[in-house]
């Protein structure tokens, strides 16, 4: 007999890390494997990723991007071609040294990212400006040998999409870089209900080998920042290293201008930490594997299960719906689907059938209402949209209430010690100040936002003339 009680989870106020771990396990998103840092995506977790993948894939294809697949292995000599790139990834690389019992003539890297493979391929297929642009995307897994791991947020192997494009001009590659960043931002806000801040990474924080890195940053329940997606403009850094040239419109050889960008299952970690509560997962409706669950009450009584099945037939025209007709108690089912974060629960029993109504319960607010069975097809899509907007607005209010503006080093240190959240402060642009803030205040630069504010004339750290406002914070 299955246990008739869903165990409680740790409260986020008591131990945020354990709260998060409890949710990913008890909501049956993942399980741990026998290899440290490698997670098993269970059906519910993978269905969530598939829904996210489907939306993103459609958006990329609609903007002219094509899916490809590159090998998992990269020869060491190929990885070494772009100096900054290899130095940036060297500590995290996993190496294959043997094939069977034989030692390989050259070590093979298990891809941490695929820039070098795409570059090698591009150098073979591009001759003229007529061959440009090339807009490629790949869905795959990558491996980075992380020391500290946590499901979705930082794992040894993770799933992602990585886009790689080459262009005729610097203007085109810059436009592509920002268009993708905007696509990521709209995906987070319009589908995951996560508000983001768009901006540029500092030189210290940018991607290894990039000319410029742009990011979307979001704020978690514990006041830490999460880098949710990045888009990189490589300029000609990689094309020069890999000799990717084309004949331009004047018959002269030029290097291509290149971009790279990606989002991963890390977004799922963000979704959990932005929306969930002490009762479990809260799923944003647009990507939820199941949007509506029907729980028959006293299903052994005549007509109850048949009515639930009839309702499912109507609702499946407008939402992803399932019936739980198992022999577990209604109480167990209520707890189970609350833990799994299903946006809407419908309860239908003999008395409800008599009144031609169902009990509708929202996961996000716990609000309960009686609704006519005849209105479900119309009401459910509107309610799912309402839930999405409510989740987004709640997360935005939380972010704004936990964002602080400071104008002095002492004020910044006090806020960082006493509060959790984003800190906005002016910066001179010097790496030395960035490193001092990291060491003495415990915050890193999250981004130089596109929407700038003039908080003061001086750098918060050294007092010299400030060049821009920066979002700072503790981060995953």
Swiss-Prot record:
SMART domains: ProRS-C_1 (SM00946). One of its GO terms (cellular component) is cytoplasm. The keyword Glycosyltransferase does not apply. It holds the Pfam family HGTP_anticodon. GO terms for biological process: prolyl-tRNA aminoacylation. GO terms for molecular function: ATP binding; catalytic activity, acting on a protein; proline-tRNA ligase activity; transferase activity. InterPro entries: aa-tRNA-synt_IIb, aa-tRNA-synth_II, aa-tRNA-synth_II/BPL/LPL, Anticodon-bd, Anticodon-bd_dom_sf, Pro-tRNA-ligase_IIa, Pro-tRNA-ligase_IIa_arc-type, Pro-tRNA_ligase_II_C. It catalyses: tRNA(Pro) + L-proline + ATP = L-prolyl-tRNA(Pro) + AMP + diphosphate. Its main location: cytoplasm. Its EC number is 6.1.1.15. It is found in: Cytoplasm. Keywords: Aminoacyl-tRNA synthetase, ATP-binding, Cytoplasm, Ligase, Nucleotide-binding, Protein biosynthesis. It is an enzyme of class 6 (ligase). Homodimer. Belongs to the class-II aminoacyl-tRNA synthetase family. ProS type 3 subfamily. Catalyzes the attachment of proline to tRNA(Pro) in a two-step reaction: proline is first activated by ATP to form Pro-AMP and then transferred to the acceptor end of tRNA(Pro). Consists of three domains: the N-terminal catalytic domain, the anticodon-binding domain and the C-terminal extension. This is Proline--tRNA ligase 2. It comes from Bacillus thuringiensis subsp. konkukian (strain 97-27). The lineage of its organism: Bacteria, Bacillati, Bacillota, Bacilli, Bacillales. The gene is proS2.
